[in-house]
Every structure is written in C-alpha cells, then in structure tokens.
Amino acid sequence: KPGIPVGVPKGKALELRDFQHWSDTLLAKYPHALQSNDEAPDAVEVYRKTLAAQPDKSVTIVTVGFLTNLGNLLQSKADKYSSLSGKQLVKKKVKILVCMAGMFPSGSEFNVNRDASASQQVYNNWPTPVLLSGFEIGQKIHTGLPLINNSSIVNSPVKDVFRISIPLDKQDSAGRMSWDETAVLVAVKGYKPWYKLERGKMIVADNGSNTWDTTKKNHAQLPGAPPQSIVRDSSLLYPMYCC
C-alpha cells in the first residue's frame, strides 16, 4: 500500500544484518521512494505527527520488533505537531498498544532483550492498556507454505520473503512460526473468540529477560497454548499476506 509514512531511529539503535538476504531481493525487485535511511524522517517525528492528527483514544499501535522508537516517543518533548509531551500525547490519542514481546510466565525473548533499556522504558511508563502476545503464542502456529504454493499470487513482497527464508531454516519446514502475525491478528480483530486475557504486568530486567507480576494489572497477555482453531486454520492469518 503506497503512502504509508516510514520513519527510522535517528539516535542510538540496533543494527542487525539479514543473513538470509530476502531484504536484498525486495530492494532489487520492487520500487521504493527511499534509497537509504538517511532520507527517512525520525520515527519519533512520524509518530508525533500521526498521533496528533488522530481523534482521541482512537489509535491502536502494534509493535512486532524492538521497542526503541516507542521508548523514544515516550521521552519526546513538545514540538510543532503537539504541545504535549510524548507520554501525554500517547495517553490522549492511543487506545491500546499490542506487542509481540516477551515469554510467559518468564523467559528471555528477542524483541525485548535486544534493547532492554527501551523495553523497560515502555513497559514501566506506557500510559494506556498494553496487550502482549508472547513467544509461546506464535511458536506453534505455522504459516507461509499456503502462500508460497499459491500460484495465483504474484509480485507479492510477503510471498517472496517466505519463499526465500523458509527453505533456509530446518525448523521452518512446516511453515514459519507466526509470532508477529498473532499480535497483528489480535490488534486488528481483537482477542475474542480465540483467547482469554490474563492481567498482570510485564517486568523487564536489566539483561532483557522478563517475568510476569500477577499482583499488578497494568498489562494483559494471551495465556496458554494457542487455540486449535488457529493452529488448524492458518487462513485466519492468511489474509494479512494478501492485502
């Protein structure tokens, strides 16, 4: 979909290389307006501009990666888009934050531990409801193979990523584990009828590991094994690849 604002972190941020090289393929195959990160605006500016223009309590933010940009957003100051601080702006405009993050009831998960300070900033200070889809939720739901085998879908960046990456990892032989997709599913369609919520609070240690404090109710997570309806019918996630 064209016209989606894109921002990048302009300060300290992780740099990870794509060892499977699907990103190289996408850049070579598909047109794109930005030639480098230097041409993109600061992600915090994109967030502030976008949030300021939305109705109050109307925005669902879904994150399927590191919390770097959201941590920076919370610490941002008033600017030309809003007289509110980052935390005030989030509280006014955001309805819920949905995250693919953490491992429950405890563990160490990639999206949280690689930028532990940003994760602590977000989970200690985010002023709206937070819903977490943990590692264990997407681990048993495999997707991608139906998309790869569907010859009617052409010129699809998402299909290309699955086509390139799945054969390169033995654990993906039955399909890619669907960590990010499950978070997007509940962000777009809600957690019902597939899940119930468990209230608590995500606690992130300095080393990036996490625990779940059931005595507090700031956050919610999707407990237990994924419903068999999702495991059996990954077409619940399939439309995300085609839109």
Annotate each predicted stretch with a short phrase.
Residues K1-C243:
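N-terminal acidic, glycine/proline-rich low-complexity segments
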